[in-house]
Amino acid sequence: MRSFGVRFKERLKRMDGILFLCTTVLSFMSLLTIFGAVDNFGKSKLVMQLAMTFIGFFLVFLISNVDYKYMVDTLYIAMFLFSVFILAITLLFGISGLNMETSNRSWLTIVNIGSLKISVQPSEFVKITFICTFAKHISLVINKINKPQTLLGLMIHAGIIVGLILLSGDLGVALVYLGIILLMLFCSGVSIWYFVAGIAALLIAFPFAWDLLAEYQQSRILFGFNPELDPFGYGQQALMSKDAIMNGGFFGRGLFGGSVYEALPASHTDFIFATVCEKFGFVGGAFYIVVVAVLVIRIIVIASNCNDLMGKLLCFGVSAIFILQTLEGIGMSLAVLPVVGITLPFMSAGGSSTLALYLIIGIVHSVNAQEKKFYFKREL
């Protein structure tokens, strides 16, 4: 009988080295940034992020050793029903995470005993179940993917989830879902003419959709592209973030240096890229971008090497999350994109978003491990 150590090493070898290295580097960089700003963020943020990191790596190891095909094939209906249920519960009983004056109801309190209050953002975890169920749905109808009734079914599937998120007021997360949907459909071979028709429909529907947005959401978008128009209101965060980045210069103010980030709201979450740049300069910001780029490229390579359609689509969906959230997170910090409440992957402090990212990386590890297993079987 093999020892636990031997079995552990064998399971560890199933994990992809590049993915693991990138995840480790980004996690360490996040902890280092929060540690350097502990006087401003508070020790609780550091302790929470440290705990989420350890739990996250355990989840990566756990999920990487699960057969993703068996998991999704067995649970995809339950995953979809759970997603609808938890988003509906959040819509009915949710609270705003940061600003109670907004109509955002994207957080759900699960523990509220005395001074102990634990809230989660279900839409972050639903990203995982949505990618799994949408990939499964596409794989079931791939032979008739360009038939209108097939696409209608896929749009209903996606529309239920995105609609519930929009109703909760979480515009930023809804946009990430939209990007995931488009990339997964594109990679599944949907005709380009459907995308052209979709863009035309969006342009026609835009004036009506605009009226459906809450006033604070409209303001975020309008002043997001030009924060100078409202420097003491909606544009203030973006402009302060931009100042923090400029204050960092090329090499930064040091781990415990910098001052602009101290007054910047959400400097440990949505605007943590500004904190990174003020402390570690252009070099630190560029380093983060390079590591994320390597991570995304590796995920795409794993998708390209996968012979299973569902595995491919899972990886492409995960890559969409990293691409969109990184671009939006950096764009917000540079004051060139609207502030829509998007966390920076493996950098922003937080429980829900951090654990969700570790879980989806675990799924990519699983896809890679299963492909290796079947590859060796074919070689033999």
Which ranges hold each PLM region?
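Hydrophobic transmembrane alpha-helices of multi-pass, membrane-embedded glycosylation machinery
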Residues: 175-185, 200-203, 293, 360-362
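Membrane-helix boundary/helix-loop-helix interface segments in multi-pass membrane proteins
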Residues: 2-13, 18, 32-168, 320, ...
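Hydrophobic transmembrane alpha-helices and their immediate junctions
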Residues: 283-326
